[in-house]
Amino acid sequence: MKSQPVTQELHFIFPLFKTISSDIMSFLVSIAGIAMLAQIVLGTFANVFIVLVTCTDCIRRRKLFLADGILTSLAFCRIGMLWVILISWCSIVFHQALSLQVRFSICVGWAVTNHFNMWLATILSILYLLKIGNFSNLIFLGLKRKIKSVFIVVLLASLVLLFPNLITVTVCETVQANGYRGNLTGKTKRTYFMNLTAMISFTLDNIISFTISMVCFLLLIYSLCKHLRTMRLYGKGPHNPSASAHIKALQAVISFLLLFSMFILSLIISGYNYMKPLNEPVHLICQLIGTLYPSSHSYVLLWGNRRIKLAFVLAMVQVRARLWLKEEKP
């Protein structure tokens, strides 16, 4: 007799608990969506500002410096990547059924923008090392003299890793689109195999890029320590232009490595949960964390470049002054 009221209470509690947990998850998804949109807007603003400043200076000087060219290309890639992420996010959250051609376009667009975003940032790390690093090694000096050729070779070599990524992404999307025609076991095996292949190809591409940037970072630290030791030997203080250039380069590279690590980790976690629907919280949170990399690192580059930083500060001062004048008017 006593067990019947308990059973009735449990039948009442479980649906209530399920409703509360569903409401909490929808609230968290909404917060993540707002944060995602804010990151994309701020990241797009920073990258557009970098493009405008570098292009304006290029037109005024009638000359494009190598660093400005890399920064501009990187900014364009990040703008494209952020908007591809936004389109993908909206299609997942709002349950929009996309055609196969649109899904192909999103996957290919993401693969291309992610690849060049990653390798242009790596080339920027190499530029910092070759421009600021101080080594007497013959190989280093030879690379420093042929810096443009080094970048062309690195960029062309990275294309060797891009094509396998494009092939695996395209085949994976085709298998997922046509998987419903076969039996469930065959579909699951094909999807697992293609996702595993795509993850291996993507991880290989990222590990090579990450390793090159890490080597540049370690060599910059060694060069800075060597420079500070020389300054101490000659009785000079540590605060000098060369040390400041080393520190700024290290800040840019370490921020890239940290944000890039978070980006890779979020994609790996999302990849291992491929069996779950894309609107599950694990995928949405991974996308939110992954968006930090292309949006936040642009502000680090903006603040580390003296010319772009000055233009940014002046623009903010002008905006603030105009707002103040509007408030003062009766």
UniProtKB/Swiss-Prot annotation:
Its main location: membrane. It is found in: Membrane. GO terms for molecular function: bitter taste receptor activity; G protein-coupled receptor activity. GO terms for biological process: detection of chemical stimulus involved in sensory perception of bitter taste. GO terms for cellular component: membrane. It comes from the Eukaryota. The chain crosses the membrane at residues 33-53, 74-94, 123-143, 150-170, 202-222, 249-269, 284-304. Residues 54-73, 144-149, 223-248, 305-330 are cytoplasmic. Several bitter taste receptors are expressed in a single taste receptor cell. This is Taste receptor type 2 member 136. The lineage of its organism: Eukaryota, Metazoa, Chordata, Craniata, Vertebrata. The gene is Tas2r136.
